[in-house]
């Protein structure tokens, strides 16, 4: 894959967090309201998806409710992934298909039955205080070792 430059300049704290998140299977970041958690997580997930050597890796940004995820993260996904040649967006499914076959989807935790059993390579849990406590052990812990982030008010890493 050619060298891709995403227009994201992490703040000093975000640079530290990116390095630390890569060292652990699960990460929890407790940060203030305007710390840039969503932008950081979206870009971390984008990098992971683009560099994952697996065939068609799958990543999820999980919000308490799907419309909330659309409001908080979808525009950022389009902003940053839109700079990658060959990227396609499915507005109705809130899905970003990257040129290497990787996929990032926004899901809501309100229907926990619908997200059980899906195979993920990475997941960001947003606003975890508003997500049922059973979601993490049933969904994230069964995700392969690659990456899960919890952000409080919000990031989880599988």
Annotate each language-model stretch with its function.
Residues 1-152, 157:
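Phosphate/NTP-binding elements of NTP-utilizing enzymes
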């Amino acid at each position: 894959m050619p060298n891709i430059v995403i227009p994201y300049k992490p703040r000093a704290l975000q640079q530290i967090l990116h390095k630390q998140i890569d060292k652990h299977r699960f990460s929890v970041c407790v940060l203030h309201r305007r710390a840039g958690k969503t932008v950081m997580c979206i870009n971390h997930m984008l990098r992971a998806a683009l560099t994952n050597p697996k065939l068609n890796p799958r990543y999820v940004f999980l919000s308490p409710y799907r419309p909330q995820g659309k409001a908080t993260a979808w525009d950022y996904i389009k902003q940053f992934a839109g700079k990658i040649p060959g990227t396609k967006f499915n507005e109705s499914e809130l899905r970003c298909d990257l040129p290497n076959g990787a996929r990032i989807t926004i899901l809501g935790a309100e229907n926990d039955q619908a997200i059980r059993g899906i195979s993920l390579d990475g997941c960001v849990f947003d606003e975890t205080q508003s997500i049922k406590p059973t979601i993490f052990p049933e969904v994230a812990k069964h995700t392969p070792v690659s990456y899960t982030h919890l952000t409080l008010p919000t990031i989880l890493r599988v």
